[in-house]
Every structure is written in C-alpha cells, then in structure tokens.
Amino acid sequence: MIQPQTYLNVADNSGARKLMCIRILGGRQKQYGKIGDVIIAVVKDALPNMPLKKSEIVRAVIVRTRKGVNRNNGTSIRFDENAAVIINKEGNPRGTRIFGPVARELRERNFTKLVSLAPEVL
C-alpha cells in the first residue's frame, strides 16, 4: 500500500534512485496504490550525469510493495521493498533495463513492455 509521502526505490536504469509519491492516479480521491497503479512522484535521489535530476516530477508504475497481494488462486506474494519503474505519458519505461522481479499483475494491467524487460515475473 503506497500513499502520498511514501518513499520508493527505482527499479530501472533511468538515473533516479529514490522517489517520493505525491499522488495516486485513478479515481477521485484514491488513498492507496497497489501493484500496477500509476503514481505521480518526485525524484529525491538521482545519479549524476543522467537525464533525470533531483526534484523532477515523473510518472511511475508500482512494481513491488511490502504489503502482500492476494491472488485468486489463494496464494499471496510479498516483496522486501517498495519499488517503482519510471514511465512516460504513453506508459513505456524511460529506462532500458529493469532490476529485480516484478509481479504478474502488471501483465493484467497492460504493462507488457515492463514485463518483457523484467528478469523475473512472480
């Protein structure tokens, strides 16, 4: 469960390291974001000499959360960290690589480009 003011790690090579969520998109006053939700975030930590700079406003999709996700088959999955991948307006990733596993729920939310770049889908 991601809410405004939550810090997330960046799971791609776009140049940002840490994001802070400032808004969850979808719905009038959506309070919490889960895996597959698009958020508006601000870059809090970035690598030098990269296109993304600190204090830049970006869109990102949540790929891992510490809060468990219950699936229809009775299983649940939980990750060690909150992580997101920075995307553009069309929903394509800004980076060229994704680090770490991503959840299968991204494929159901039509983020197939993110799923194809990920090294592991759980």
From Swiss-Prot:
Subunit annotation: Part of the 50S ribosomal subunit.
Alphabetized SUPFAM superfamilies for the sequence: Ribosomal protein L14
Organism field: Pleurastrum terricola (Filamentous green alga)
Family recorded in the similarity comment: Belongs to the universal ribosomal protein uL14 family.
Record Pfam families: Ribosomal_L14 (PF00238)
Protein name as annotated: Large ribosomal subunit protein uL14c
Record-linked PANTHER family: 50S/60S RIBOSOMAL PROTEIN L14/L23, LARGE RIBOSOMAL SUBUNIT PROTEIN UL14M
GO molecular function per UniProt: large ribosomal subunit rRNA binding; structural constituent of ribosome
Lineage top rank: taxon: Eukaryota
